[in-house]
Each structure stands twice: as C-alpha cells, then as structure tokens.
C-alpha cells in the first residue's frame, strides 16, 4: 500500500475545500495561536501550508517521500515549515515540546491493527508538552461498513483520469485506484490499492487515554457538534480534540 503512485495527482482529484474545514476546526480548538505544531501524515502539505500563517513553526512529516516531494515543491516562501520523512510508529525521541499535533484525512485508519494505533497515539502524545492539544479524525464504522460498500467514483481532466472502487470486509475497506496519465497521444496506467481500517468508538477513546491524554472530546461535522450516538448514526467521521 503506497501513495507514491498517485502523489502527483493526489491534490488534483482531492476535495481541497475539506482542508479549509480542517483549518477552521484547528483554529477554533485553541484560544491562542500555537507556537510549535507537529503535522502527522501531512501528505502533500496542503493543510500544513494553510496552517502555517497561524503559528511560528510547523514540523510536518509523512511516510511517503513522493508525497513530500510535492509538498516541498509547493512550499514557496513559507520558511516556518520543515518537511521530513518519518513513520508515526517510530518517531524520534528528540522531537518534543509541541504545543499542538494534528493528524487529519483519516490517516490513523491506514494503520494495520489496534496495536499500531496504540503505538502511534503514544508516540504523538510523547511529542506534546503537558497541556498540549492533539486533533485528529477517523472514519466511523458507518462510513466504512455502509457508505463505502460498493462505492465507485470517476473523474477526469485534460491530463488525467481517475477510477476509484472500494470493497468492504467488516470494518476494513480497500480502495482500488486506477489513474490514467496522458503521455503524448497515449495514456500511462497507474494502479494502487489503499487499505483503511476503523474501530468502534470505545477502542479509540481507550487508546487515547492509554496513550496519555487526560481529556478526550468526540465531535462530528468538523467540530461543529458534539457526537451523540443516536443523533449522529450516519456521521462519516469522528473528530477528536484531546489534551495531554
């Protein structure tokens, strides 16, 4: 499973307006602008660049070097961003004292099992200073088990075409992506499979508390409403606002 094959077209077919909603959620979650931020699984850096004007320093990392190459190429004059390659399961112990950490775009769902989830959350918590804020989102079981079941999508422009199909097994969804990239009069076909897994809410809450967070708030609609089990049965994402 890798984003390498689709790094160059990731933003082209992504809903970039969603990143503005993540930014609003982030800024509304703190009373004072954060000085030092860790952006976990930053991808092509779209959210990182949106947040940069509101903080002093952002360290942003991703597992996929191809995604980071795109991020660096779009960085421009934002000198307060530092991109680097890293695995959220093996973070450098010297990276500490962050005011805030973010992990959006359901990135935690790409971890393979509960043990990896627990390890990643513990590493993130250890990077934060006491009272530091962690913001993230994950797919809900409804989204994975129902909304993604039989999902298919097609989009195209002058240079690329995207075919996207999803298969579901339990709370695991496999996304089969095919990109056709125009090369002169021909098209190059690029195939990749991305697998995501989610869990019942209790698993996430328990893992966050065990990782070292003292407060865990669960929200929906990009932080617009506190999650209520009966009222939000068809919510697509859970948003977590956590304090160390």
Positions of predicted regions on the chain:
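Residues lining the SAM
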Residues: 104-106
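A short acidic, Gly/Pro-enriched loop at the edge of an enzyme's catalytic core
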Residues: 93-100
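Class I SAM-dependent methyltransferase SAM/SAH-binding core
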Residues: 46-90
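Conserved class I S-adenosyl-L-methionine
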Residues: 1-35, 46
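Class I SAM-dependent methyltransferase "Motif I" SAM/SAH-binding loop
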Residues: 41-45
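SAM-dependent methyltransferase
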Residues: 135-205
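C-terminal lobe and adjacent flexible extensions of AdoMet/dcAdoMet transferase-like proteins
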Residues: 201-244
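A short glycine-rich, Lys/Arg-flanked "PGG" loop and its adjoining helix->strand segment in the class I
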Residues: 118-130
């Amino acid at each position: 499973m890798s984003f390498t094959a689709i790094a160059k077209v990731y933003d082209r077919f992504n809903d970039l307006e969603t990143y503005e909603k993540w930014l609003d959620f982030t800024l509304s979650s703190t009373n004072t602008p954060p000085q030092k931020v860790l952006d976990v699984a930053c991808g092509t850096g779209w959210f990182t660049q949106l947040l940069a004007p509101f903080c002093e320093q952002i360290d942003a990392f991703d597992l996929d070097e191809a995604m980071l190459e795109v991020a660096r190429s779009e960085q421009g004059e934002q000198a307060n961003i530092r991109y680097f390659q890293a695995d959220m399961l093996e973070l450098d112990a010297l990276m500490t004292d962050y005011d805030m950490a973010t992990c959006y775009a359901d990135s935690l769902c790409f971890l393979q099992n509960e043990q990896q989830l627990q390890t990643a959350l513990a590493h993130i918590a250890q990077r934060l200073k006491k009272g530091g804020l962690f913001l993230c989102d994950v797919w809900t079981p409804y989204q994975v088990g129902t909304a993604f079941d039989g999902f298919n999508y097609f989009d195209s422009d002058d240079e690329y075409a995207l075919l996207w199909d999803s298969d579901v097994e339990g709370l695991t969804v496999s996304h089969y992506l095919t990109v056709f990239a125009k090369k002169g009069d021909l098209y190059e076909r690029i195939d990749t499979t991305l697998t995501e897994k989610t869990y019942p809410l209790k698993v996430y809450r328990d893992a966050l508390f065990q990782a070292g967070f003292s407060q865990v708030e669960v929200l929906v609609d990009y932080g617009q409403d506190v999650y209520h089990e009966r009222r939000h049965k068809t919510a697509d994402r859970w948003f977590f606002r956590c304090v160390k």
